[in-house]
Structure formats: structure tokens, C-alpha cells
Amino acid sequence: MSVTSRYREAWEGFWREAPGEPGAVFWDAEPALTAGLHLALFEPHMAAAGLPVVDIGCGNGTQTRFLADRFPRVLGVDLSAAALDHARRADAAGQVDFRQLDAGERSETEQLHAEVGDMNVYMRGVLHQCEPADRQPLLDGIATLLGERGRAFVVELSEAARPVLMGLARSPAGPPPKLAPVFAHGIAPAEVVDAAVDAYVASAGLAIVAAGELPLTTTEFAADGTRIELPSRWLVLAAA
């Protein structure tokens, strides 16, 4: 099933208004603090490291370009055309194949798999802010892209992140400047409980190969100058 038009328009609006400079978006932390840490956890579980890598929900492509420095073929896919405009402008070397794709739409993931074959998947912070009806189709789409040989690294805000975010949103001074646009566009982060994620994985015919906890680093800082980090959970997935 396709995502709702409201959800799609929320992300188009967000990325149309987002600044282009690095680190201007709340979750756009430098790869050394994000994809670099994730890759160290992911690579030991890649059964076929030579497969193409697809970054689902790539946004402006910061992490995707990092992956492209390390793997021979990398695709960045996103629901938002405006996000992909940012990503292509930042990819001066043309390292990444950026495409608009709804990963929860079965026909689109099947078409991509038919073209590319089995893939390794990287997805950071997408499921937790999806609308409820879109969550299972997203995991089903990942299963399609993985095929038999692929592995997925999925990192999502844990349920423990919600009170942290709500505390930031309700502070007397208002939410931090980089977090405010997320709420302003009607995007609701940290909406999925941990047990539900495991259920979506199982229903998609996937198995959890490895799992752990790691703070999701943001580009925003608290009033005391410390960087805001959100509790998150990572999973390595494979066909069951």
C-alpha cells in the first residue's frame, strides 16, 4: 500500500523548507557519529558484502554518501522529491543513485528488486515516525529488497525516546530550533513501542540476527551545551 498523501506532503513540506547546509536538520549528524558507528556493527553480519546497498529514507544523503565511499554500488531512496533535490545537489561526485521510492509500496520494491537483485539495506529513523498503517508494509518492503542473501541494519528510536522528545517539545522556551520544524510539519517521532517493531519484523518473514542499543546522535544541543542524544535500538535483519 502507498503512504497517505498527508504523510507524503508533510515530508515534502519539511524538505522544501530545510536549509541546505550540513547539520541544519535535527538528525543530520556527521557520519562518524552515525553511519560510521552503525557500519561497524553491521558489516560482520553481511553474508554477501558485495551486494548493492540501499539507504531507505536517505533524506539529504549525508549518510548515503558515506556508504558510497565504502561500497561499490549504493542507492539512496526517499519518499520526498524535495529531499532528493538536496541529496543530488550535495553529491557533486555523482557517487549515489538517488531515486524517489515508497518503500511501503509493494510494486515499487518488487520492481527495484527485479532490477537490482538482492540488496543490503540501511535504514535509520524511518519506522518510528511512520503512520500506523504504513509500518508493516515498510518492513514487508525491506524483506522484498533483501531477498535471500541481503541483510538489513535498522536503527530506530526506542520507546524510551518519546518522553525525552516530549520534554524538549514542552520546555518553557519551546522546542530546540532544529526540532521545531519536525513538529510544525506534523511529523510525529518515537511513536512505535519496541515490542511492536519485533512483531512487524516477524510478520514480514524476517529474523533478528543481532540487536543492541545505541544513542541516536542529533545535531542539536541542550541549554547546558551537551549534544542531544536519543535512546535508540538497532537490529540486523535477514530472511527467516
Predicted regions and their residues:
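Conserved helix-to-beta-strand junction in the class I
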Residues: 144-146
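Class I (Rossmann-like) S-adenosyl-L-methionine-dependent methyltransferase catalytic domain
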Residues: 1-114, 132-137, 141, 150-240
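A conserved beta-strand element that flanks and buttresses the S-adenosyl-L-methionine
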Residues: 122
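A glycine-rich helix->loop->beta "capping" turn
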Residues: 116-119
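A short His-aromatic
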Residues: 128-130
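Oxyanion-hole/transition-state-stabilizing segment in secreted/luminal serine hydrolases
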Residues: 125
